[in-house]
Structures are given as C-alpha cells and as structure tokens.
Amino acid sequence: MKKFITITLSLMVAMVFLVPQNALAKKPVKIGVLVPLTGIVAQGGLEMKYGIEMAAEEKGTVLGREIKLFVEDTRVKPPVAVTKAEKLVYKDGCKALIGVFSSGVGLALSKNIDKLNVPFLSTHVMTTKFYNLHPLVFRSGQLANDQTAVGNVKGIMARPDLKDRTYYVIVHDYSWGHDAGERFLALAKENGIKVYNNTYDKAPIKTKDWSSYISKIKASGADGVYMAFITNVIPVFAKQAADFGLQDKVKLISAAAPGPLELEAGGKACYGIFGASDWSWDVDNANSNDWEMRFWKKFKTIPSDAAVHSYVGAMNLFNAIEKAGNTDAKAIAAALKGITYDGPYGKVRISAKDNCMRNDAVLTETMAAPENPFGAKVYMKVLETFSAKELGPAE
C-alpha cells in the first residue's frame, strides 16, 4: 500500500512538471489595432499598422508577457469601427485599443468607450474635440488641428512669399476637415493673413475629379490654397492642380502630411507643398536616422509620418501598461497621463491635463529628393522646427 501511494505521488509530481509549460504559461497581453485597410486611405492605414507592429516587436513583452496584436479594418466607417471594437474587446479579450485614422471614427468610438471600458489611444485623429474628451481616451500621434494650424501660420508669417498672399480654403467635408478649416481661419484672422472665402469650400471625401474646385480657385484670383484633405488625396489634388496650371501661380499649404508613396506617384506636380507635421525622414538626429533604417529594412517601403507617430503612440501605450503593473483599464489610463517616450522626433509626452500629446514638430516643403536609401524621388524637406511649447496648447 505504501509503495502504491509512493508511486502515485511520484506520478502526480511528474505530471505537475510536464503540464505547466502550456497550462501555467503567462497569457499574452492583447491589444486591438483599428486601422483602415480598404478604401481611400488604405495606404495610410497600412503605414499605421506597420508602425504599431514594429513597436510591438521591438518592445517584445509587457508585464513579462507577449504582446499580441489583433488587427481589424475600420473601412473609415464609424459603425463598422464600433462593431469591430466590440469584437476586439468582448470576443478577443483586448485590454486596450489603438490606431484609428479618422476623426469621425475616433469620436464614434469615444461615445462607446464607457461600454467598452478599455483605454483607447489614437495615433492619427486630429480633431480638437479629443482634448479631455474622456478619462479613457488619449491621443499620441499626428498633430492635432490646432497644433498644425499654429505651425502652418508660423511658417506663413515667417516667409514673405507665403505671407503676402490671399488664401482659398478648401477642406474635406467631415468633422476633421471642418475643424482644420476653422482653426486656420481663426489664426489667419489674428495674424492678418488674407483669406478669400471665410465660408470655406467643403468637398466630399469621395471626390476624385477636382476640376470644378480648381476652376473656382483660379477664378477667385487667390494665390494661395489652404487645404485640409485626407493624407492620400493631397498628391492627387496637387497633380490635377498642376495639370490645370494652377501651381504656377498658387502656393499650397496642407493641414495634413502627404503620403510618401502618393508623392512618388505625383512626381514633380507634388513639389512645393508646405505643411506642419510630426516628422519626415529628413529629420536629422541619431534616433530618427536609426529608426527610419530599421523601418526600411523591415518593410521595404518609404518611412512615413503615419508609421512613425503610430510607433511612438504604441510605445507610450506599452510603457503605460508596464507602469500600471496590470491590465486594469483605470490603471492603464492613470499611467498614460504624463507618460513620455523619447523617439525619432524627440520627447512625446501625453499631457496629464487633457490626455493629448505635446511634442516638437517640423514645417516641411515637398521637393526633389536628394540621394537616399529608400529610392524616393520626392520628399518633405525640413524648413523649420517648432517646440512643443510653441505649438501648444498651454497647460
């Protein structure tokens, strides 16, 4: 009997050491990634996805656990995004949501965040409505509309060839475009910048033929255009404007950074677009230079603003989870407040006051690219750097 008990105990001990490799292994920390992978901004969504994936790979683990990304296509449609978010949280068990390209989608998700009860960090939404929107909603990514407008207006005022012009304002007809237009108009008025149409033009997102708008701009006599178009559309508009001879007389200022692959497709027609943004691969510091080469080696595509600020946003989220010490929603949210990541464009800090990031940014102009490892023919040349304090908002 004693021998039987001894054998039984030995078998039980053996089983304990055989099973735990899987049974007792730490479960991964699941993060839901919401980006547009089909439709008009699919390329921008892909670049965001690349940045987040690169951050997850380089971070490796949080809380000693694997980071597992669950990626869903929002199709830039708010109802679709909300449904996908519910799937990520309720079915997949994601502890945080990250990404989101458009302001409309971001605001729709924010309305449902109490029900979802997980932190949501956008790496691309630019609407000023995100400031202090909800205790679980954060921004660490593309400059907000007010920050972009400040950078663009500072750039205009510092350059006589831009300052002494009359601007025709045209935006995409949805929440982000309206907000971007309003922000520019307010600052233009404060700084004495002439505007032709204070009731700015609103173009449907699906617009492909810009000829009627270009004809109106030419007829107005304006010699500057302030445009708030989705990233991927900017080079399309510029190409058509060049075909109509508009660019010979007009300077283009953009409220969003143009996509690098679209710039390549537009070629010389895309020269001369000014705009404030977080970053371009012309930013020259050791961290930026190293990051862009790592990105290039991994994805074999031109490093983009969308990719880099999504990378930085993801790093802020992952580090906040580490700081929280667990995956509780309120604990992660508390850790996100005031967190800082020192990355390719310097320190990016999420303000504890309003849950939105503050960071330095650059004013760029698109032009022929110098020799570069990416084979790019067009690039965003850095003209000026703005400090986080200059861009605001004040805290």
Descriptions of predicted regions:
Residues 142, 241-311, 322-325, 370, ...:
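Extracellular/periplasmic periplasmic-binding protein-like sensory domains
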Residues 33, 88-101, 121-123, 166-171, ...:
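Periplasmic-binding protein-like
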Residues 28, 43-50, 58-131, 140, ...:
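Beta-alpha junction/loop-to-helix N-cap segments that form part of ligand/metal-binding clefts
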Residues 1-9:
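Bacterial N-terminal signal peptides that target proteins for export
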Residues 29, 340-395:
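Solvent-exposed, acidic/polar segments of extracytosolic/periplasmic ligand-binding ectodomains
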Residues 322-334:
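Short, charged, surface-exposed loops that flank catalytic or proteolytic processing sites
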